[in-house]
Design a protein with these regions (language model features):
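A glycine- and small/hydrophobic-rich beta-loop-beta segment
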Residues: 78-87, 91-177
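General beta-strand structural signal in soluble alpha/beta enzymes
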Residues: 1-2, 26-30, 53-58, 63, ...
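Cap/lid and interdomain-hinge subdomains that line or gate substrate/regulatory clefts
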Residues: 1-36, 261
């Protein structure tokens, strides 16, 4: 609990950790790095006595456990890819903050090329497949010419009348898979990829780029990590920027793209 962390009850927390069995779930109510340091001290003591744990955490946990010092935000120098091709930004999130960030990003029209992925093609026979093919072809031409491409899904929500929640979910998954496949079908290596949205960025990394192992380079902005893709991935040695949907200010996406193009 937060009280145990605040009074620095390392021994008491360690005893709780030692008593956990059969994949018991342990929830840590830490609200600061100071709280996390207390918990990690107890965790290390428990691990030294032979206990093993599987952690599902945010980045703060690995920072404290690894005793990683604060690092400056990454800049253009560290994010330069090994190609003169343009980059690609893929925006799948529909939350209001993402839409506001997209509208702000459009101020770079002329410096980047914007392409809207028509999600309503999901209702046409082979519509999504054709839309993916169209988008990939156009994007590759721009990337090869050194231009950065911004691909975003139509902002309207598709919710036809009389459609069940299960049917809506099925459509949502089909669209999400189609959007992710754009990266998977690219035959040219972009100098960077930015994926916007929690599900979008996860699927692009694991499914489209087939990343099994990556080096975490740091953050380009607060809460926005950057991977350097591994040798086994579709595009080895490329900066991959993971931008969750509800993170950043209205201008954050524009600032990142502006620095990279």
């Amino acid at each position: 609990s937060l009280d145990e962390l605040n009074v620095l009850d390392v021994q008491g927390i360690k005893e709780k950790l030692m008593s956990a069995q059969n994949m018991a779930k342990i929830i840590v109510n830490a609200v600061s790095y100071a709280d996390l340091k207390v918990f990690c001290a107890a965790l290390v003591l428990a691990m030294k006595e032979g206990k093993h744990y599987m952690a599902r955490t945010a980045a703060a946990f690995t920072k404290v456990m690894g005793r990683i010092s604060d690092q400056p935000l990454l800049g253009r120098e560290q994010l330069e890819g090994d190609t003169k091709n343009g980059g690609i930004v893929l925006i799948g999130s529909h939350v209001k903050k993402t839409t506001d960030q997209l509208n702000c990003l459009k101020k770079l029209d002329g410096q980047a090329d914007f392409m809207e992925f028509q999600v309503n093609t999901v209702f046409e026979e082979n519509g999504l497949e054709k839309e993916v093919e169209r988008t990939v072809k156009a994007a590759e031409e721009k990337i090869l010419s050194g231009r950065t491409v911004v691909i975003y899904t139509s902002r309207q929500l598709l919710a036809p009348e009389n459609m069940t929640p299960e049917e809506k979910l099925h459509i949502s998954v089909k669209i999400s898979n189609a959007v992710t496949s754009i990266i998977g079908k690219l035959s040219v290596k972009p100098k960077f990829i930015i994926a916007k949205g929690g599900i979008t960025s996860s699927d692009v990394g694991t499914k489209a780029l087939r990343v099994k192992k990556a080096r975490v380079m740091g953050q380009v902005k607060k809460g926005i990590p950057v991977w350097m893709t591994g040798e086994e991935s579709k595009f080895p040695g490329m900066p991959y920027i993971i931008f969750p949907g509800n993170v950043g200010e209205v201008s954050t996406l524009k600032e990142i793209v502006e620095e990279l193009i």
